[in-house]
Amino acid sequence: SDIKECIQKLRQLNPSKKIIVEEDNISQLKEIIDQKVEVVLLDNMTPGQVKNCLKIVNGRFECEASGKINLKNLLSYAKTKVNRISIGQLTHSINNVDFGLDI
């Protein structure tokens, strides 16, 4: 598949760099399961889907859950024992402060 070829080319060009692949369904995950990647981003999946993906991955690489995760459903994702969890809610409503330091 195209994603397999892409991963293999990236690995050849940058053997020391981490490769992180985003997948949004189990079929996509199965396509890359035998590839050498460091992290798979499981995007917009339910906790049940994340748990199923973790069974398929079986420790081959780290997995990060992201998308539609918020402070209300965070515990459900944490219970899956996924390696990483991203919560966009933390940064979506942030107001930045622009300041400078003059010496």
Model-derived segments and their meaning:
Residues 15, 38-39, 60, 99-103:
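Glycine-rich tight-turn/loop motif centered on a GG-T
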Residues 77-103:
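Flexible C-terminal active-site loop/helix
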Residues 12-20, 53-68:
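Short beta-strand/loop segments at the ligand-binding rim of alpha/beta enzyme cores
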Residues 65-73, 93-95:
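Short secondary-structure transition/capping segments
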Residues 1-49:
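Glycine- and Gly-Pro-enriched alpha-helical subdomains that act as flexible
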Residues 7-9, 17, 62, 73, ...:
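Short, flexible coil/linker segments at or flanking structured domains
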Residues 27-38, 45-59, 69-87:
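Catalytic cores of alpha/beta
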Residues 21, 42, 65, 86-87:
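General beta-strand structural signal in soluble alpha/beta enzymes
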